[in-house]
A protein has these predicted regions:
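Membrane-helix entry/capping segments
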Residues: 2-11, 15, 51, 213, ...
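Hydrophobic alpha-helical transmembrane segments of multi-pass inner-membrane transport and secretion
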Residues: 15-41, 273-308, 335-336, 416-441, ...
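Mid-to-C-terminal secondary-structure elements
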Residues: 118-134, 145-275, 472-655
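Small-residue-rich transmembrane alpha-helices
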Residues: 32, 36, 241, 252, ...
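Alpha-helical transmembrane segments
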Residues: 29-58, 349-358, 427-455, 735-743
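Hydrophobic, regular-secondary-structure patches
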Residues: 44, 53, 58-116, 123, ...
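Membrane-proximal juxtamembrane linkers immediately C-terminal to transmembrane helices
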Residues: 42-63, 89, 131, 189-192, ...
Length: 785
């Protein structure tokens, strides 16, 4: 019997190829989109879950209180880890992680600057699951000058030699011995590194700060079995105050597996990666629903043409139960074929999708089994619902009435299809409007004026003892025609940190805690970055006090001080007691996702970490070569290493750009699926009304009138979908935009454009079938009447 059902189903597929293609392809594309998005979402959700101790791992974070506002910080003081472990019951172990990049590593004739180095406590390799291919994780980081490297680094420096025991020289002075080789760090680890060095080395080199008021490093803890997060949070809440009584900082633990999706830094909690997971999950659901609606719509429409088949089967002895099983089986087989085809599409497209998403995606992702089981369930449900109309309605017909042609599709079935079309286009419109707003917001952030010029600007890290040659290098560069300006700073201008270090000015409430961005700079900073001044002047060598005694602040500081003019006012901050000589116009010194906060800069040449060089526009290659030639002349022992500031910004928003591209693709596919369904439905509607069209043409109806008649119903359904979608999209996207400090407007043109696109899609889908029906010779439609 089952074999017979399959044979009949295959026969129907080949007999009605167009219908079968539209129905199966639409559902398959929808399922494939859902699977691809699900794999991406599951990969996002899988971050850091591969660690054996993942459920008991946490990052220590801070909530700093400033004038009623909370500044959330993910870095902590250097000595916090051991102290919190020793003094807090329930904490099993602690590990500190410090970024220690920017080191020159040399082995024989190979020398490279390495940026992806972490200095960690020895407990790091016991707490976290980062297996070693060579070496012992329990002892690999015990010696201060030991080094654990990745396979890639081992190949880079030692080729096919055994790296164990080899000596690498750091910054031409300190020798480190390779004591371990790491397996490749999984891509779904938020901690990424190529090398691990002992934290003890930093202490020995005097590169740590024992103050509990300085936040620079990450601190991770592992809880004892059976200890709850709430218990430990209660114990550590006021820990900083036991060391710094004047502090307004609280501690809390962040579950390690939540860091990738839910971490935030600063005053405002932005949407973060979790928001995009929610968006893509909704898109996957919408696309799948649209595809399933298509399938059910076309199946019920097509079944109306099979009444005579039902009559003939009953005449030759088929029972109603046989027909019910036949229609259910046929519908489920159709849906199953679509599922198999979807799996094949995903397998074929996964490499390209991985490249587009910049991820290592595969079927082997945690949770995919549950998704597949769910999709199989949806396949069966869709097949059963789509088969219910022919199985239960058509199978109840009396053969005599069917064969006389006196049975017609009821109003209930027609209205059901109309409801499905409206629902389908409502979802499509939500996707179109939502994707447009998301893409518009991403474009707005990337195009937003920063308040300083990032074009043709490079920065050079002043690593190791390069800093000693800074002034000589600057003097050589400023004489070059390819260079328009040279300066230095302790931070790159797109990532200036904030500080709460004892700010004061006349009239300030001593109890008022404020957080101010701070960067040490060199002369020519304002001019090189092309920052606009609102009041006062830039730093000048002509003023002796400008060296470590003068401040330039932004408009936010001036507003904080509450005075019309702050130039000439006394101002103290981070141990510098001086005077404000100028006010800069506000500029973005962190991500454009963040609100511009107060900022102060001061000339302190000893604290410079970066050289900033503005190249002459035009032949950038020649300008870079000129800078490199000067570098090699002044600092021959170190390779020339630089970054373009605008490329840094591109990297900063690259993930969001990729997400915007993915949103566009999936929305286009969703609309395409809706088009397929509407095209098929229009075809069957025209077929059902063939006789009516013939009569109308005999009575004098023109081709345009008949075309309008057939298109009108679908246009009205799409307009109704707009009425339903607009308020949902407006309130949904308005809420989403509130996650951003600086956001684009929710223009009414977006909604009008979405409506126009939906109507255009409907016209393109329906008009072909309508025109074909309208130009048909009425004699063909009425020849049997």
């Amino acid at each position: 019997m089952i074999k017979n059902y399959i044979v009949v189903t295959l026969r129907n597929i080949f007999k009605h190829k167009g219908y079968a293609f539209i129905n199966i392809a639409g559902l398959a594309i929808g399922m494939a989109c859902c699977l691809l998005i699900s794999i991406w979402v599951l990969d996002e959700l899988s971050y850091d879950r591969f660690h054996e101790n993942a459920p008991s791992l946490y990052r220590v974070e801070e909530n700093q209180h400033y004038s009623g506002r909370i500044y959330h910080v993910t870095v902590t003081p250097y000595p916090l880890g051991p102290a919190i472990k020793d003094e807090t019951a329930g904490i099993k172990d602690a590990a500190r992680v410090v970024w220690a990049g920017g080191q020159l590593l040399r082995y024989q004739d190979k020398a490279f600057f390495e940026s992806n180095i972490r200095a960690v406590d020895p407990s790091f390799l016991q707490m976290f699951t980062f297996p070693l291919l060579k070496g012992d994780k329990d002892t690999a980081l015990d010696a201060p000058h030991s080094l654990v490297i990745s396979e890639e680094i081992a190949q880079k420096y030692f080729s096919d030699e055994d790296p164990m025991g080899k000596v690498i020289t750091v910054n031409n002075t300190i020798e480190f011995t390779v004591t371990g080789v790491l397996q490749k760090v999984p891509h779904n680890s938020h901690l990424q590194f190529d090398m691990l060095a002992p934290y003890a080395f930093l202490e020995k080199a005097g590169r740590t700060d024992q103050s509990f008021g300085s936040n620079s490093i990450f601190t991770f803890v592992q809880l004892e079995e059976g200890v709850t997060l709430a218990e430990v949070n209660e114990k550590i809440f006021g820990f900083i105050r036991t060391r710094e009584p004047q502090s307004a900082t609280d501690l809390e633990l962040m579950p390690y597996t939540r860091i990738h999706l839910h971490q935030h830094f600063g005053f405002e909690k932005t949407m973060g990666a979790a928001g995009y997971v929610y968006i893509f999950s909704i898109i996957a659901f919408f696309v799948l629903i649209i595809a399933c609606i298509n399938f059910m719509n076309l199946a019920t429409a097509r079944s109306a043409n099979r009444a005579k088949e039902v009559g003939l089967r009953k005449v030759v002895g088929a029972l109603r139960s046989h027909l019910i099983r036949q229609f259910y089986s046929e519908s489920v087989i159709f849906a199953t074929i679509a599922l198999v085809l979807a799996a094949a599409i995903v397998t074929l497209l996964l490499p390209a999708f991985s490249s587009l998403a910049d991820k290592e995606l595969s079927w082997n992702v945690s949770g995919i089994g549950a998704i597949l089981i769910g999709l199989i369930g949806i396949t069966l449900f869709t097949g059963i619902v789509a088969g219910s109309y022919p199985a239960l309605f058509l199978s109840s017909f009396q053969p005599v009435k069917v064969l006389r042609g006196s049975i017609k599709s009821g109003a209930g079935a027609t209205n059901f299809r109309r409801v499905l079309v409206v629902f389908q286009f409502t979802l499509s419109l939500l996707l179109i409007i939502g994707t447009t707003v998301v893409f518009k917001q991403l474009s707005y952030m990337q195009a937003r004026k920063l308040g300083w010029d990032k074009e043709h600007l490079i920065y050079i890290p002043l690593r190791a003892d390069i800093k000693q040659s800074y002034q000589a290098l600057k003097e050589e560069l400023v004489r070059d025609q390819h260079v328009l300006g040279v300066t230095g700073s302790s931070h790159i201008p797109s990532n200036i940190g904030s500080n709460s270090g004892g700010s004061s000015w006349e009239g300030k409430d001593p109890e008022q805690a404020v957080l101010i961005g701070f960067s040490s700079v060199d002369f020519d900073y304002i001019e090189t970055l092309k920052i606009e001044m609102k009041e006062g002047r830039a730093f000048s060598r002509e003023h002796q006090s400008d060296l470590s005694k003068s401040f330039i602040v932004n408009e936010e500081v001036a507003e904080l001080m509450g005075k019309e003019s702050v130039v000439g006012e006394r101002f103290s901050f981070v141990g510098v007691d001086g005077q404000i000589v100028g006010v800069m116009k506000n500029f973005h010194f962190q991500s454009v996702r963040e609100v511009i906060e107060p900022l102060a800069i001061v000339v302190v040449p000893d604290r410079l970490q970066y050289m900033l060089v503005r190249l002459a526009p035009g032949d950038i290659t020649a300008s870079l070569q000129a800078v490199e030639n000067t570098w090699e002349h002044v600092i021959p022992d170190y390779p020339f290493d630089y970054r373009f500031m605008d490329e840094d910004f591109d990297r900063m928003y690259r993930a969001e750009s990729r997400i915007g591209t993915l949103l566009n693709y999936f929305t286009i596919l969703a609309v395409l699926i809706a088009c397929l369904g509407l095209f098929g439905l229009a075809s069957f509607t025209a077929e059902q009304r063939t006789k009516e069209i013939g009569i109308r043409k005999v009575l004098g109806a023109s081709v345009s009138q008949v075309t309008y008649l057939l298109c009108r119903e679908f246009f009205l359904l799409v307009l109704l979908a707009n009425v339903l979608a607009w308020p949902l999209a407006y309130f949904g996207m308005k809420s989403w935009l509130e996650n951003y400090a600086y956001r684009t407007g929710l223009s009414w043109m977006i909604f009008v454009a979405a409506m126009a696109l939906a109507l255009l899609v409907a016209l393109a889908s329906v008009s072909f079938q309508a025109l074909r029906a309208a130009v048909t010779n009425p004699a063909r439609a009425l020849k049997y009447e």
